[in-house]
Amino acid sequence: MSNINFLPTIEDAYGALSAEQLDILRQQVLSEGGDIASIQSRFNYAWGLVKSHDAEDQRLGVKLLTDIYKESPMRRRESLYYLAIGCYKLGEYAMAKRYADALVAHEPDNAQARTLKAMVEQKIQTEGLKGAALVGAGLAAVAAAAGFLLRQRRP
């Protein structure tokens, strides 16, 4: 059994912290020296940022998680999971899939990681279908306009 089966779901990432709660996390990081703050303080702040409704906050959260991933081998699996969620929220589904794939590759029996990967893949498929529908609608509109113009040119 994996040691990260207690992590939040994607749905949990949409429960934003209050501005006051997020500021407390930010102040903790600053009081510890900012970039040299403890991994735990930066991690808590990063997760609070990812949960935000503001895309810029989310991007900063993903950046902090990326830094933590690089700096702390002990937090890599956890960082991958949270990075996948952060990228998912930002609509960066290809990156979310990369992180989820990496996590599942290391922990194939982790049910939460597999569920996260499946959700990301479902979103990619849904977005792909929406894109195909938009392209199809665009092509139909162009064909209709071309047909109309060709009829107008006939004497």
From Swiss-Prot:
Q: Name one Pfam family in it.
A: Fis1_TPR_C
Its gene is: FIS1
Q: What is this protein called?
A: Mitochondrial fission 1 protein
For this record, the Gene Ontology CC terms, alphabetical, are: mitochondrial outer membrane; peroxisomal membrane
- Per the similarity annotation, which family is this? Belongs to the FIS1 family.
Q: What is the lineage of its organism?
A: Eukaryota, Fungi, Dikarya, Ascomycota, Saccharomycotina
- For side Cytoplasmic, which residue ranges? 1-130
Mitochondrial intermembrane membrane side: 151-155
Q: What species is this protein from?
A: Eremothecium gossypii (strain ATCC 10895 / CBS 109.51 / FGSC 9923 / NRRL Y-1056)
Its domain comment says: The C-terminus is required for mitochondrial localization, while the N-terminus is necessary for mitochondrial fission.
